[in-house]
Amino acid sequence: VNHSKGKILVIRGGAIGDFILTLPVFQQLRKYFPQTHLEVLGYPKVAQLAVESGWADACKSIESPGLVRFFAPRGPTPPDWLHYFSQFDIIISYLFDPDQLFQTNVQQAGSHHYIQGPHRPNDNTRLHAIDSLLQPLEKLAIYDVGMIPDLSRLARCQTPAKESKVQIAIHPGSGSPSKNWPLERWTHWCQAMCKDSHYHFMIVAGEADREAGETLARHLPDHCRTLHMNTPLPSVARAIAGSRLFVGHDSGISHLAAALGVPSLVLWGPTNLEVWQPRGKHVTVIESDQGLGGITSRQVSREAHRLMDGGS
């Protein structure tokens, strides 16, 4: 594709963390094709982050019923979708497509350059997920590694809080209970911090974390916390960006906080750290040989204060 024009489509489903780990793909495409229209086909609630942060120009929903036809062998494909795909010079797909049915059907739309990326990075390697997701760009002669997801543009849009309290954003949940620090530890730590009226907790919770978020909120004084339940992701991002510190687990929200550049303390469980940890000098990971239950409130307090004091 000519570096001064053309259109590139990146197809990426997945949850919040999966998408944020793919942001460096958009960042590199924007760097090497600055004048090219860059579009994302994904879940709008998540993919809109790429548009609002300036890495993509437009977002289209992957949840359209018409796309189902593209996963059927020799099935009739909707003309409107064929026309849509025909507009792009390069299509990079991270969809699970083991039999190449989707690719075969999309290629009916024209002679664009189709690049298949990994649906999910390999947990059994030592290669970070970001570098795995960047590998397809080698077909475009882009070989950069070590990239960090960057949502700093969203952070710059955040107006600093006028109140004098120090805001700490926390996410007491994740996609799996095995990745969570025990809720009683969260409660103990937050209650101890709330004894200092200087701190205010912003609790982030989605549908999967509802119980953890609500339970923790009930155990904290009203003046010491706010609860953001099922808040739209760009709004959550801006709220986290206004925080002095983020504390969470191996979750998409932790990747979001890291991408915003917020000093982050991540309590790590059983997942492969080399592959999945949020990147950045401002990110500190705590893990224990005894698992998450081996992480103490005292450890978390010590690291939290160090990060809020500007430590790294």
Would you name each region that the model predicts?
Residues 1-312:
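Catalytic machinery of carbohydrate-active enzymes
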